[in-house]
Structure formats: structure tokens, C-alpha cells
């Protein structure tokens, strides 16, 4: 890592929470004050997806999100590209708040600045491996040259 990139931040996540259910905002304070996920589920009928996630990743760093099945890995990644809206928190990419992006800016961000490979992906069975790999570039209009 060079000296220049040590002072830059690529991805910053601050105080990220996700509560799934019909009225997540009503239960946020209780979760922030220590209500555990079992109590939230059993008494309020809501599911705690993420609790107080904070991280910084500098440009060029490689990080791994690891955990058991159902621990929130995919939920976290889907928040970074805003496929899921958080209940609370901040997500900054290159200093820009992803949560403040309008629809057009968000589409551009998703198609040019971020990517995600889903756990259960589907290849086009009638394409070769190379054609499947080229597909994303082709739909963006990138020439093969």
C-alpha cells in the first residue's frame, strides 16, 4: 500500500443497522440499547439482520466477509450497493454517501463502480464460458477490441 492510499478511504460504513419487518424504525432504539435478536423476533415479530456495523476499507485493500450461514454476509454486501435499504447508518464509497444517491446516480454506481456475484448464480446454458464472461461488457456496449 503506498503512502497516498493510506490516507484515502474507499468504503466507510458507520453504525449500520438492518431490522426486517413491517415497522423496523419503531424498534431501532431498543436494538441500539441492547435488545437481542431473539427478543426482537419473539416479542415484536421482526428480524435483526445487521447490528452496529462499522468498517473502513482503503482503496486497493482486499477484505473477506466470512461467517456462518444466516449471519448477515449477503445482507451486508447488498447494503453496500443499496439492493437493501438500511434501517439506520451511513455507507460512503469514495467519500460519496450511497444512501443519498438518486435513481439515475445509483444505476450508474451499480453498473460502473460495484459488482456482486450471487451465491446461486445462473450461467446462460447456450453460451460458452467466454461468452458468459463477456456478457456484462456486451450489455454495457463495450466493444470486443
Regions found by a protein language model. Give the residues of each.
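Conserved ABC transporter NBD signature motif
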Residues: 89-97
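Helix-to-loop junction immediately C-terminal to a conserved catalytic motif
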Residues: 81
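The feature captures the beta-strand-to-loop junction immediately N-terminal to the Walker
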Residues: 66-68
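Short helical segment in ABC ATPase nucleotide-binding domains corresponding to the A-loop/adjacent helical element
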Residues: 130-138
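ABC ATPase NBD coupling module
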Residues: 40-44, 99-115, 139, 144
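ABC-family P-loop ATPase nucleotide-binding domain
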Residues: 1-46
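Beta-to-alpha transition at the N-cap of a short helix in the ABC ATPase nucleotide-binding domain
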Residues: 119, 123, 128-130
